[in-house]
């Protein structure tokens, strides 16, 4: 979803062009209904050599003028090279992934190699060089009317259609990125005391979310939407929320694409990597401690090497997060 500015800005600069997106099966579903794309071609991430050959032949027929390669991976470069072997040879724009800059910051704490751009802005750089004005890096998604109506029906079923609520994403792809579950429990209590409700979001089977569901099973103000919506239906739900509080995960980006302010909790990762929230009302909350071990990972994968386990997340107080969250609720009782 962070790539959506590319399609919009390409369309504005080249209104008569035909835009085709090649993406992995599953990941690209979030881009359905995008009015700037003429076609989405899905491929399996674990395709065989014959599958890849067939894909290249399918792409070659279209005779592209431009390849905008945001992956800059071995596979994407191989596909691009194959397409450039035959006339007409398309122009090839390649993204600088800043992998070395991230590794230098992780290993040595060197931040001087980052240019201050978000990842969204970084992906726009090849196009920006052809445009005098600054391109917009705001993301966008397009749930269908049916998606929105389905979510509205769920909200009505739970008497949430006219209530203020905050969505909570307590899980993450890796444990290091998770704010302590006890802190989430305390935060939810504060939200309920303020008069608002809470909707738990995420995938089905996530341990942290399931623990919160069990803990608040008798509450009339905590609801779980984990695993019951498609990706675009989830986007529609987040659009209807007052705010989102989540770990450094795709939930934050999903909400912001729908213009819902988010509070993102960062621990092993840092804003210099380019994935900080973008909206003016959104907030990135991180530890106030000067930890030499931080950042420790590009994605949050791995084990904590600090003797005070996950101090980067445990040192983020519930009060600090609540102080940010309550500003996004109407007439909140502090």
Task: Label the predicted regions.
Residues 1-334:
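Catalytic machinery of carbohydrate-active enzymes
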């Amino acid at each position: 979803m962070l790539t959506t500015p590319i399609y919009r800005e390409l369309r504005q600069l080249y209104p008569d062009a035909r835009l085709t997106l090649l993406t992995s099966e599953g990941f690209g579903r979030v881009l359905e209904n995008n009015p700037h794309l003429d076609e989405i071609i899905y491929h399996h991430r674990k395709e065989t050599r014959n599958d890849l050959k067939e894909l290249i032949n399918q792409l070659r027929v279209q005779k592209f003028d431009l390849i905008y390669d945001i992956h800059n991976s071995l596979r994407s470069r191989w596909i691009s090279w194959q397409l450039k072997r035959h006339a007409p040879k398309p122009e090839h724009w390649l993204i600088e992934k800043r992998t070395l800059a991230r590794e230098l910051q992780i290993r040595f704490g060197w931040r001087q190699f980052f240019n201050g751009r978000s990842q969204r802005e970084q992906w726009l750089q090849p196009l920006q060089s052809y445009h005098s004005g600054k391109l917009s890096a705001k993301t966008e998604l397009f749930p269908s009317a049916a998606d929105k109506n389905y979510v509205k029906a769920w909200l009505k079923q739970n008497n949430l259609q006219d209530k203020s609520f905050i969505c909570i994403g307590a899980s993450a792809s890796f444990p290091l990125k998770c704010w302590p579950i006890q802190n989430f429990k305390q935060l939810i209590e504060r939200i309920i005391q303020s008069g608002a409700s809470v909707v738990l979001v995420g995938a089905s089977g996530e341990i942290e979310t399931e623990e919160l569901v069990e803990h608040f099973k008798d509450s009339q103000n905590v609801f779980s939407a984990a695993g019951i919506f498609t990706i675009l239906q989830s986007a529609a739900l987040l659009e209807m929320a007052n705010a989102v509080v989540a770990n450094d995960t795709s939930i934050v980006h999903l909400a912001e694409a729908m213009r819902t302010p988010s509070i993102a909790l960062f621990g092993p990762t840092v804003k210099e990597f380019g994935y900080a929230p973008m909206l003016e009302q959104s907030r990135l909350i991180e530890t106030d401690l000067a930890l030499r071990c931080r950042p420790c990972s590009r994605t949050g994968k791995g084990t904590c090497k600090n003797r005070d386990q996950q101090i980067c997340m445990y040192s983020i107080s519930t009060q600090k997060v609540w102080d940010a969250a309550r500003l996004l609720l109407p007439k909140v009782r502090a």
